[in-house]
Amino acid sequence: MAKTDGQQSGGVDARLAGAVLTVDLAALQANYRLISNRLTGGATASAVVKADAYGIGIGPAAKALWAAGARDFFVAHADEGVTLRGHLTDARIHVLNGAHDGAEDAFLEHGLIPALNCLGDAARWRAFCAQAGKPLPCVLHVDTGMCRLGLDRREYARVVADPSLLD
């Protein structure tokens, strides 16, 4: 709902801003539940809250989604994951851009789960787990045709032919 006549919304004068966005967190929760309740076969819904929850605020959005039942959250970068961890201590937080070389310790410290986007990521994560002395969670990201992130067809075929590449 836009505020007018100088009404304040979050410290913003709507007359000067041109428009003010009001986020209905109850609607966000209802939408999550709607999707989640339609899933079958053990599938679960996740919440993508990258880029400050697409500009609506990672803290309020994530807390609302957690209250609605979300347990898996995705962010783009590790710094977003660290911020999210400050709001949700028990959530599973996945980082779509993975653990960049040298950032692995932060993943362990903050309980972040990297997406492995190529076989090089898998090898680096495997080496870090060996150094840490224990297996650590990760997810495998496969490019589904958008050509952004994830194993391409050739790498995917290599993994299918030799699953030990992910050991």
Label for each model-derived stretch:
Residues A2-A17:
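N-terminal amphipathic/basic leader segments beginning at the initiator methionine
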Residues D13-R15, A19-T22, A27-Q29, A43-D167:
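Active-site-proximal beta-alpha core segment in soluble small-molecule metabolic enzymes
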Residues R38:
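Conserved PLP-enzyme active-site core in the AAT-like
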